[in-house]
Amino acid sequence: MTALPQDTDWTADASRPAQARIEREAHKLEKRLCREVGRAIVDYRMIEEGDKVMVCMSGGKDSYTLLDILIKLQKRAPIHFDLVAVNLDQKQPGFPEHILPEYLAATGVPFHIENQDTYSIVKRVVPEGKTTCGLCSRLRRGILYRVADELGCTKIALGHHRDDILQTLLLNMFFGGKMKAMPPKLVSDDGRHVVIRPLAYVPEKDTTRWAQQRQFPIIPCNLCGSQENLQRKQVGEMLRDWDKRFPGRVDNMFNALQNIVPSHLMDGTLHDFQHLKATGIASDDGDKAFDAEEFPPAPALPGLQVVQIS
């Protein structure tokens, strides 16, 4: 038997295919993120020529992903728009103040750190054990609107993704008795600011993978996101479970938000049921109430055998 050379590098040879696969998957993920963010921007006309977009940075995976992909799209977009990254330092104890400024400086994107002690206000006003999310978000929103005015920004970009939108829909249905989600684009209550959500088509699993791939310096939120047993967390876990057990279900739920049939719901403000009368004219929105809905067959549950009974 011929002996192998002693200097044979087995580790290097074995690692090349694995490394190539990792790089290939990362490239596919980047292309998908750019495609989905670009599609949302076009579908809802989120960014226009000459816009100055304020990208709100929390230090979480989603806002990092949002800024990162917008920087990539800015370089290839057919229009000119500017970016400015803004972080609100809410003076939480132990908050690593150096992380975001150092990261943002390295990107080359103009940035602004707004220092406001909302942490003390929230802790003083909200009783111990109660959810702080509502008050924290209202305080943060007001400050960010003011900063947008001061910086001359025409759009405010938030990092909410597809799963956030679906969670909000289900939370409103389960606990609020209304069909309401997060819009991809909205005008603020005072009519002065346009808020956009460029990650609207992006599933959370993609922002998680991108954050890992890019090794973003994640800053955890100790005020709201880390509180246990919140309704949003429970709904999020339910959606993730559905996504694993019933492939396509979450996608179809999201698609339903873009495919509304008001005449087949029960909201009289969206469809005039009061004055509905027979006209003798065929309607595309006509009566199919007695037709059996046709749906694709659901996949069998794990461990169960599907038996056809004739």
From Swiss-Prot:
GO terms for molecular function: 4 iron, 4 sulfur cluster binding; ATP binding; magnesium ion binding; sulfurtransferase activity; tRNA binding. Keywords: 4Fe-4S, ATP-binding, Cytoplasm, Iron, Iron-sulfur, Magnesium, Metal-binding, Nucleotide-binding, RNA-binding, Transferase, tRNA processing, tRNA-binding. Pathway: tRNA modification. The keyword Lyase does not apply. It catalyses: cytidine(32) in tRNA + S-sulfanyl-L-cysteinyl-[cysteine desulfurase] + AH2 + ATP = 2-thiocytidine(32) in tRNA + L-cysteinyl-[cysteine desulfurase] + A + AMP + diphosphate + H(+). Homodimer. A motif (PP-loop motif) lies at residues 58-63. GO terms for biological process: tRNA thio-modification. Signal peptide: none annotated. Its EC number is 2.8.1.-. This is tRNA-cytidine(32) 2-sulfurtransferase. Its cofactor is Mg(2+); [4Fe-4S] cluster. SUPFAM superfamilies: Adenine nucleotide alpha hydrolases-like. It is found in: Cytoplasm. It holds the Pfam family ATP_bind_3. [4Fe-4S] cluster binds at residues 133, 136, 224. HAMAP family: TtcA. Belongs to the TtcA family. One of its GO terms (cellular component) is cytoplasm. Catalyzes the ATP-dependent 2-thiolation of cytidine in position 32 of tRNA, to form 2-thiocytidine (s(2)C32). The sulfur atoms are provided by the cysteine/cysteine desulfurase (IscS) system. The gene is ttcA. It is an enzyme of class 2 (transferase).
